[in-house]
């Protein structure tokens, strides 16, 4: 009995390693040649900035402000026309999208070119809603560099013409290292979400805010 259990546990461990390693390799194959520095990215209609938390005073976290700065670079270089900020709005006093929009406006981005998605609860939901709620077809997704391969893969597999920009700062922190480890499980979850064809957690009516903004740019 003990020998059987030991073999069973060993088989489970081997299977888990294969699944995790397979997920890691798969997202890198899909995202290959689709990740760029902001100044070198090809044009896409929309920059999709993924939420990354707020400080206690309600301003974007260090990670989030880094992502937003990448969006500013893309917009000012004419590499995107609209910025879609997608994050958590769990309570009336916690709104990542509002904080993100305010940050961008302070950086000189016209408010009419900043669109807020208040139900981007995770990367999958943000990409899904960008497509089905906001009508986005062409996107530069922005996150930290340790998870940009998965972000690009998520949007690409959901049918968006996707490239990605990964912010590198701050790099040498325990949060960054934990993020790298967490990605291993997140890759597997993405595969499960795609197989199950999961909808975004929160859907709602279609919006024309992105397409209206693009129309003002002649897109």
Residue spans of the language-model regions?
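A transmembrane-helix-recognition feature enriched in membrane-embedded lipid enzymes
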Residues: 177-199
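N-terminal type II signal-anchor transmembrane helix
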Residues: 1-39
């Amino acid at each position: 009995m003990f020998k059987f259990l030991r073999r069973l546990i060993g088989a489970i461990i081997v299977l888990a390693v294969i699944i995790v390693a397979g997920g890691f390799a798969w997202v890198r194959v899909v995202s290959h040649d689709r990740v760029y520095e902001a100044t070198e990215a090809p044009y896409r209609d929309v920059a999709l900035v993924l939420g990354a938390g707020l400080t206690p005073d309600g301003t974007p976290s260090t990670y989030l402000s880094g992502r937003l700065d990448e969006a500013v670079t893309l917009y000012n270089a004419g590499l995107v026309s609209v910025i879609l900020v997608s994050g958590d709005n769990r309570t009336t006093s916690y709104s990542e999208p509002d904080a993100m929009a305010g940050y961008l406006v302070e950086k000189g981005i016209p408010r009419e070119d900043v669109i807020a998605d208040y139900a981007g609860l995770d990367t999958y939901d943000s990409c899904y809603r960008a497509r089905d709620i906001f009508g986005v077809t062409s996107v530069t997704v922005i996150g930290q560099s340790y998870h940009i391969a998965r972000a690009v893969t998520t949007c690409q597999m959901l049918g968006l013409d996707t490239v990605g920009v990964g912010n590198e700062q701050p790099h040498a922190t325990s949060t960054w290292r934990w993020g790298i480890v967490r990605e291993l499980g997140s890759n597997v979850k993405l595969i499960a979400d795609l197989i199950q064809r999961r909808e975004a957690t929160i859907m709602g009516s279609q919006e024309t805010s992105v397409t209206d903004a693009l129309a003002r740019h002649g897109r």
